[in-house]
Amino acid sequence: PQIETLKPGVKMTLLAEHPALVTPTGIDLDDKGRIWLAACHTHFRPEGYEGPQHDEILVFDADGKNRRVFYNKTDATMHVEVGPDGWIYLAERDRVLRVKDSDGDGTGDTEENLATLDTVADYPHNGLSGMAWDPNGGLVFSLGENFGKDWTLTGTDGAKVSGRGEGGVFRCTADGKGLRRIARGFWNPFGLLVRADGE
């Protein structure tokens, strides 16, 4: 289909498409222009699905070429965000984690949980989802309405936030400390953005 841009001078170029990627649920760019993408193979996986058992965190060069799998050990992966010091941040339904390639082979081999969600709800896309960085280097992420079930979110330092039936936006440090809720009253807030002024 023909795509029309709304702003003069903006150009859109197709860089990658199916079958190189499947069900993209998050995308980010790093300082080298590489494209990081969460390809979700586990969201309502159909019977007889022949794709990978888990979701894939894919990396493409800036031109959309040289597809490689960085990580493939998460399920219901709803977002990917490039972070500081080589960490790649992921939002799964029940946790926010970060993954790093510590030996330089291009594959994530070190994983750390930053925030874990304790709840009986398991619907794949109304748990943890969107992520962004605030101007002070804090990680901002969101939680959906969680099917109206009780939940408790816990950071790496033991800080806890609990609730029921409403989505929200949370902030913690890049290593999962100081967890706190900064907004509430959302359905499933996937596309988080933080302006330069922190709003």
Residue ranges of model-derived segments:
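Beta-propeller domains with acidic blade repeats across secreted/periplasmic ectodomains
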Residues: P1-E199
